[in-house]
């Protein structure tokens, strides 16, 4: 027995337009990491561009380069951790990069690199990201060193849960994130995933 998935292009476009509507027509970051979860990142990115998605989230530099080389003309954000050589290459290619440690920030400063950076904060996923209580220090470091801080984000770890505990945890994450970004004027402040919109 074989298993396969068929994607209806028109349904996908309709779903994206509905998500945009639910999100007050804010810009959508189309996450197409891991080959668009096995569906084909180039193909899915092209479909998403047909409905105005021009910013794509990827796991690593290699995935972003694949889309660039396939002729996808858009912004790209590496959501995962980047090694130092990847930070250099991302800067050369104009790829936005998630930054989740002071070590990465110091490397950028020491090597006179200034890519578009998005600070990732850990509000409960417990994987990558700055701790919430580091926010002021990290943001001040970026400002003091004239780093090109264009975004701040976190990940809702349990937004698809349907228990009182998971809903409360998601609300706690949102409150932590609101405290981090309060008073900041950045182009990209992103927290939500598909489940988090509803």
What are these regions (language model features)?
Residues 12, 33, 67, 101, ...:
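Conserved, mostly hydrophobic/aromatic
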Residues 6, 118, 129:
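Short aromatic/basic micro-patch
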Residues 1-96:
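A charged N-terminal "starter" segment
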Residues 100, 107-108:
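Membrane-helix boundary/helix-loop-helix interface segments in multi-pass membrane proteins
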Residues 37-39, 46, 91, 110-115, ...:
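Active-site loop/helix belt of alpha/beta enzymes
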Residues 56-59, 77-83, 100, 115-123, ...:
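Non-cysteine beta-strand/loop elements that form the S-adenosyl-L-methionine
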Residues 99-102, 176:
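A polyampholytic, Gly/Pro-enriched intrinsically disordered region
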